[in-house]
Amino acid sequence: MRHIIQYTILLLCCPLMTIAQDFDGHNWMQHLDDSRTIASLSIPGAHDAATGEGVHMVSGFGKTQELSLAAQWDCGVRAFDLRPAVIGEELHIYHGPIRTKISFGKALEILCDKLAEHPTEFAIVLMREESDSENSTERALWPSTVGKAIENIGDKAAIFSPAMKVGDARGKIIFISRNAYTGCNRGAIIKGWSHSPQGTTNATITSLTDDATARLQMQDYYAPTDKEKQKAKEEAVLQCLQRAASAPADVWTINFLSGYSNRWLGFTPFATTSGYKRNAQRIHPIVIDSLTAKPQPTGIMMLDFAGCDKTGGGIWHWSAFETFGAEIVDKIIGQNFK
């Protein structure tokens, strides 16, 4: 009854947002065997997850999520793209130059609270430094400030290893960063990230504990702003999905379905929220159909509007978007149990 009341309130607050829930997303990982490698799982994630907490700018720009971090968790999301920047001496989460309404510390507190409530689960936090708003002094502080924030959560931060198992991670956060941080030996650093349509099969994830290194195959082609590029994005997502299907159990896959299909007046970095919605409306059904026709492991799949099947319109688009964000989260989770 409590969960029904929570979702009723959420729907009343967001009348243009439709949320579908076919299972209990709070603790779906309880059904996973402890011996399974995390690299071999199918895990739904949220691209620029903190934008669901609100942004300090007109929401027509840079907003990639409708749900809060807690609500993303509740619908089954377990990978969170968080991009902290040092402002003064504190960490705030940004998307490019756009500041969200939540600090990095508060975001970690929310995830730690969820893990305390649901100790069978684990979370993955993908990080990168969002340096657009930092000055040179703040950039120099980023590695140590992030390391201190992770160190502050103690053993809630997991020790990364290439073939780490579900049982190793329950109740913990796995930190995987695209920028090096210092002062903490938990988590891991990515090298070789690519934004090309082809992605890469030769990136690496290296543990800060013992330098053990995993191979990473990934795709993050984020600006499919015309028809040709949109087709390339579709092919890139499906190619990365195909690679995940045949990957060894200790090879990690990160597949960003996210992207924006139009820009404000043709310029970057002002990617419009409606551009992200339009991309989700096109890409998500393609992946859902692929997984329906041929179930397979997916790796970590980063989504826009995770948990929302329908969202409101935006700049130059007044009608609602069918973003299929709840259906695709359910579909990804379901691949673990085929």
Language model features with spans:
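Bacterial Sec-dependent N-terminal signal peptides
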Residues: 1-21
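Long, acidic (Asp/Glu-rich), low-complexity accessory segments flanking structured domains
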Residues: 21-75, 88-117, 122, 183, ...
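Active-site beta-strand/loop microenvironment that shapes enzyme catalytic pockets
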Residues: 76-86
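Conserved, mostly hydrophobic/aromatic
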Residues: 83, 125, 175, 301
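An acidic- and aromatic-residue-enriched active-site/binding cleft used to recognize and process polar
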Residues: 84-87, 127-130, 178-180, 306
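Active-site periphery "cap/insert" segments of enzyme catalytic domains
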Residues: 90-104, 132-153, 165-166, 170-173, ...
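Active-site groove signature of glycoside hydrolases
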Residues: 119-134
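Surface-exposed substrate-engagement region within the catalytic domains
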Residues: 152-295
